[in-house]
UniProtKB/Swiss-Prot annotation:
Uracil binds at I196, G201, D202, A203. It comes from Legionella pneumophila subsp. pneumophila (strain Philadelphia 1 / ATCC 33152 / DSM 7513). Binds 1 Mg(2+) ion per subunit. The magnesium is bound as Mg-PRPP. The lineage of its organism: Bacteria, Pseudomonadati, Pseudomonadota, Gammaproteobacteria, Legionellales. It catalyses: UMP + diphosphate = 5-phospho-alpha-D-ribose 1-diphosphate + uracil. The keyword DNA damage does not apply. This is Uracil phosphoribosyltransferase.
Length: 214
């Protein structure tokens, strides 16, 4: 597996919070709060290379050239439904970002992604896009979502997740070798049901309290 396009964000705060999220006894409320906090920390890293330019401003004491973000506003694209759990924290850091949603569910028999919703901001072309989903398991949902985004000709695309599997990374970069993956951890493997092991269960279920995590 080629890890040149994979960035593991091994920050102590992220790893500590992720450990609590993994615990089966962590409540829905606590899980949701931690997801918000971790997403802010991940967003800080994934936006590290945004372009800047300089504008002249006046401080109370002097005039100076000071850096500001260059170009059009970012676009965050959430893969529904669990991707929404990452958005609030990211928007707190980048409140001017545009938001898109791609609805995909995984067929339980084939594990393939099935699309049911697609809505992205106008003029996504020439913008930097960050596609978000907490789990990169089989990679099928991420592959399908990024394919849709690419059709709109953005300036750049990155994929951000909490956890990734080796299989998911391999599958994703088999289809999109040009798209970097940012993740908090790479776990051991997938089980027969396509869940990341040891993982944290089903991120959507744990976010919204819809059923017990696997």
């Amino acid at each position: 597996m080629d890890f040149n396009q994979v960035k593991v964000i091994n920050h102590p705060l992220i790893q500590h919070k992720l450990t609590i999220m993994r615990k089966k006894e962590t409540s829905t409320v606590k899980f949701r709060t931690l997801m918000h906090e971790v997403s802010m920390l991940l967003a800080y890293e994934v936006t590290r290379d945004l372009e800047i330019e300089y504008e002249e401003i006046e401080t109370p004491l002097a005039t100076m050239q000071s850096p500001v973000l260059k170009g059009k506003k970012l676009v965050f694209v959430s893969i529904l439904r669990a991707g929404n759990g990452l958005l609030d924290g990211m928007l707190q850091l980048v409140p001017t970002a545009r938001i898109g949603h791609i609805g995909l569910y995984r067929d339980p028999k084939t594990l393939e992604a099935v699309e049911y919703y697609f809505k992205l901001p106008e003029h996504t072309q020439d913008r930097d896009v960050i596609v978000v989903d907490p789990m990169l398991a089989t990679g099928n949902s991420a592959i399908a979502a990024v394919k849709e985004v690419k059709a709109l000709h953005p300036k750049s695309i990155k994929f951000l997740c909490l956890l990734a599997s080796p299989e998911g990374i391999s599958n994703f970069h088999g289809e999109h070798p040009d798209v970097p993956i940012f993740t908090a951890a790479i776990d051991e493997q997938l089980n027969d049901h396509g869940y990341i092991v040891p993982g944290l269960g089903d991120a959507g279920d744990r976010l919204y309290g819809t059923k017990l995590a696997h």
